[in-house]
């Protein structure tokens, strides 16, 4: 079965070079093609990474809820959110829908979990 993916790209500010979004997208397209993934959606937005309350994240969640994707591809996990607790909550919500997060730079989520446990925080 071919993995269906949503490519997610984000820039923090509109005054950043617009081509950076295209560069992120193109790198993710190549990454997906090399692995034989089927790109179902490309989501690109400009906004702060401090919160998950963004249209692109809602679009991604909708695709997951409708079982249209198997994974979300990002160039770096920080493109999703800069807050590790919120990133783990997003990962949990996606996982319940059978959707994983795949980063071109590797997966720091286990380190995020260890940090949260060390701080005595529980993610529901």
Regions found by a protein language model. Name each.
Residues 1-124:
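Short, structured surface patches at the beginning of a domain
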């Amino acid at each position: 079965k071919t993995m269906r993916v949503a490519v997610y790209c984000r820039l923090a500010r509109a005054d950043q070079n617009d081509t950076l979004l295209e560069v992120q997208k193109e790198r993710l397209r190549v990454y997906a093609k090399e692995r034989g993934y089927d790109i179902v959606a490309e989501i690109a937005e400009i906004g702060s990474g401090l919160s998950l309350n963004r249209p692109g994240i809602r679009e991604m969640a909708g695709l997951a809820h409708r079982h249209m994707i198997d994974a979300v591809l990002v160039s770096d996990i920080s493109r999703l959110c800069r807050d590790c607790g919120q990133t783990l909550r997003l990962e949990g919500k996606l996982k319940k829908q059978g959707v994983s997060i795949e980063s071109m730079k590797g997966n720091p989520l286990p380190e995020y979990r260890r940090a949260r446990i060390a701080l005595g925080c529980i993610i529901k």
